[in-house]
A protein has these predicted regions:
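Active-site anion-handling motifs in enzyme catalytic cores
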Residues: 2-424
Length: 424
């Protein structure tokens, strides 16, 4: 449990420190976006100073990301505030487990031995060791509760967590316990919402906050550019499928006359894309080219100026969505978080779902049918989604301010705005 210092050093007019916590210390594109969005929007009116916290201190600024401090340091820096808002914002954080989080931070050579450790020494012992190693006061790395964080208001910003009910009883119980022990929960897709309904956890359904990234990094394609098709696949999903993918992409490029941009989106262990995409480049030759810097703005530019995105990355698809580019969820039955998000929020005529053997046919059909009317409809839907995300952020700050001024019980739904928190 984190001890607190009585009293407050806060003075009227001072900025209040807010902690944004997530997996921002590894190169996984989507996680890095959450920190940027929260800092941009929460600091906009001058009331808050956002501390970007993760499992450990890191500096991925060479990739366009925000540096992080360890959560332990962020808690130490905010102890003298009477109340501190701690926002958990990041992807599938509800089901992230210690072996994955610690594995991502380790050298590639020991990633898989770390992943196997809970099965060798037992999950309960591995949790104890992980808590001691990271000083994170929770049995799960990204699911925090207020019982072990007195004086903090823990809130969850449009997070994900599919298949909670299939987790081991020890993990399942920890998720339920901590989510019922926080101020506010919002989730980003119907699958996660259904899982929390089973647990009896009150929550709101809100789009992924990364849809706001186009407000922060506006993009305009050059009129002279013919456009391209973005393709992405993670190493895990590419195994034994490279040749079949190459055949599909060759056919797609030949039929459309468009080149294929093979885009690296993640470089962290467990999220690395370089190896399968390099192999595809070798097979596709002049029909394709690599975009592999890993820099956030290069990734955004590549997707925003494309004609179509096809891949296994959820935040590749969300980036396409927010710039009104049609999306194809690759391997939808395997990448549930991706297919679930698109099914929850995106108009059917603006997205597609494809197994490997369906890539060329699905992409060609979507490119043919996606015209100006469909683009206008998608842009309108994106604006509605952005409004819901902004309302969610405003609701969280309102809950915090209510608690700091009146110490009244917080409620889950924003007064007068409940319609903003239902999927279309």
């Amino acid at each position: 449990m984190i001890d607190r210092i009585d009293g407050s050093s806060h003075k009227p007019g001072d900025k209040m420190n807010v902690i944004a916590y997530g997996a921002y210390d590894r190169h996984n594109y989507g996680d890095l976006l959450f920190a940027i969005v929260l800092k941009h929007y929460l600091e906009a009116d001058g009331r808050f100073r956002v501390l970007i916290a993760a499992t450990k201190q890191s500096d991925l600024s060479s990739y366009g990301a925000l540096p992080t401090i360890a959560l332990k340091k962020a808690l130490e820096a905010t102890r003298q505030q009477d109340k501190t808002m701690l926002i958990v914002a990041g992807g599938e954080c509800l089901t992230a487990q210690w072996e994955s989080i610690i594995g991502y931070l380790a050298p590639q050579a020991i990633y898989y031995p770390i992943k196997a450790s809970p099965y060798l020494i037992g999950h309960r012992q591995f949790i104890r060791l992980s808590r001691a190693f990271t000083s994170i006061p929770s049995d799960l790395p990204l699911v925090l509760g207020e019982r072990e964080l007195p004086g903090y208001q823990v809130m969850y910003n449009s997070v994900g967590g599919n298949e909670i009910s299939r987790k081991k009883p020890l993990i399942h119980a920890a998720i339920e316990r901590n989510l019922k022990d926080c101020t506010y929960v919002s989730v980003r897709d119907r699958e996660t919402s259904a899982e929390l309904d089973k647990l009896g956890v009150e929550h709101n359904l809100v789009p992924d906050s990364a849809v706001l990234i186009s407000d922060i990094f506006p993009q305009q394609p050059e009129p002279s550019e013919p456009g391209h098709i973005v393709f992405h696949i993670s190493d895990h999903h590419a195994k034994r499928r490279i040749e079949a993918i190459a055949r599909q992409l060759t056919e797609l490029s030949a039929s459309t006359g468009l080149k294929i941009a093979l885009l690296t989106i993640g470089k962290a262990p467990g999220h690395s894309d370089d190896e399968p995409l390099d192999k595809l480049q070798g097979l596709l030759g002049e029909r394709a080219y690599r975009v592999n810097s890993g820099h956030i703005q290069d990734i955004i530019r590549c997707i925003a100026t494309s004609r179509l995105y096809c891949g296994t990355s959820l935040h590749g698809a969300i980036t396409a969505l927010t710039y009104a580019v049609p999306q194809i969820a690759l391997l939808p039955r395997r990448v549930v978080k991706l297919s679930s998000f698109l099914e929850t929020w995106v108009p059917q005529q603006s997205c597609g779902f494809a197994e490997i053997e369906q890539i060329s046919q699905t992409a060609s059909a979507l490119l043919t049918s996606f015209g100006e009317p469909q683009k206008a409809e998608l842009q309108a839907m994106v604006e509605l989604m952005k409004n819901r995300v902004r309302a969610n952020l405003e609701h969280m700050t309102a809950l915090y301010e209510q608690a700091t001024t009146a110490d009244e019980p917080a409620t889950q739904s924003p007064t007068g705005n409940t319609t903003l928190f239902a999927a279309h």
